[in-house]
Amino acid sequence: LTSACNYYDGVTQKEAERFYSDMKDPKDETPVSYGLNSRLVKENGKLTEKVWKVGGLYTQAIEKIVYWLKKAEGVAENPEQKAVIAELIKFYETGDLKTFDEYAILWVKDLNSLVDFVNGFTESYGDPLGMKASWESLVNFKDMEATHRTEIISGNAQWFEDHSPVDKQFKKDEVKGVSAKVITAAILAGDLYPATAIGINLPNSNWIRSHHGSKSVTIGNITDAYNKAAHGNGFNEEFVYSDAELQLIDKYADLTGELHTDLHECLGHGSGKLLPGVDPDALKAYGSTIEEARADLFGLYYVADPKLVELKLVPDAEAYKAEYYTFLMNGLMTQLTRIEPGKNIEESHMRNRQLIARWAYEHGKADKVIEFAKRDGKTYVVVNDYEKLRTLLGQLLAEVQRIKSEGDYESGKNLVEQYGVIVDPELHKEVLARYENLHIAPYKGFVNPVY
């Protein structure tokens, strides 16, 4: 028993892995997301799945979801959206994962609805094996003005894929159906409440992405609220090295932060491909961290590309430095404010950020690309060479994509364990003490409006 979650009741990791491995057919090119919507338990010594559906586990809650979905179906914006909702209801009533895939395909093809939603067992970050998903929902409407930015990015998706530093055999020959928009969240629920993601790219199924594409969203009102809350709270003044970086951040960081999210969601998650026969779950517990690193690295590599100046997405060739500095400061130092003293990093997104920042720091050491500087007894991150830093990020992107494409478990594990997990206790202690003086909460949440 190696898991603290309730997805595997009395079941060991080896038993769970064998149970799902036996279900899989390596020749199946359109596999379902095995185990996504169930708890695996032992009954009379035999492994069995308790499926989350009407009449199954959590039926009372799911019946209420279905009740409201049926009401939504009656006021759907168009026939496409009505079909999406009907298929989702069918999934909740049957628990059938093929039906879930059918729903996901219909959902990804509905590009005309101004009001849209996420609803279902979606992200598997809470499962150490990366298979079982927590429930989440979000209702949103399209921000027409801000969507112009993401449409430029998604309209150039093939160019970005073709020019990435990744080995050609791991690239998509043809990028399909990358749709992107900026949305306003109207209500949050489940695992997206009260603290939500700032960007979402779905569906998670690799074959659906390849055959049908994906939907990417940047949640504009959430990002805007975070940005406004961060201005003037003293955080940057405490942790940023000098006025030069502070001025960069003041001038560009809101824009480059949003662009990095767009690139991460629109292009990063949708880029690359698995080699034939590679199990999508091959990286097991390290899969989520590797996938987030892949998307972040794609975004970081391209936020510095002259193509963004050409597309008029950034005003000049200096803007990206704000994103590089804040990302490294966060990955090397300031995200440690969310970790208790003496603990290591467990959460996938945080592991990914430290992995990227630490790897770049270690591999750029000889050229002093990034350094830790001391001033008045305080530690700061200094970036000495932004161009070399971009080259390093490109090298890491190529390796992370290789690991994902080949399902190279050992390399993925080594990368995460070596760079993404261990916390420097002295630095951690210092960061916590400095942060405490600012009286800022490490996480921010949102209150749902009453409609």
Question: Each PLM stretch: what is its role?
Answer:
Residues 1-247, 253:
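Contiguous, non-catalytic segments that form substrate-binding/exosite surfaces or channel walls
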Residues 78, 288-305:
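An active-site-proximal "capping" alpha-helix that borders the catalytic cofactor pocket
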Residues 79-85, 100, 278-281, 308-324, ...:
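Short, glycine/acidic-rich hinge or "gate" loops at secondary-structure transitions
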Residues 268-276, 304-308:
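Conserved helix-loop functional segments at active or binding sites
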Residues 272-293:
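Post-HEXXH active-site segment of zinc metalloproteases
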Residues 300-403:
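Long, well-structured alpha-helical subdomains associated
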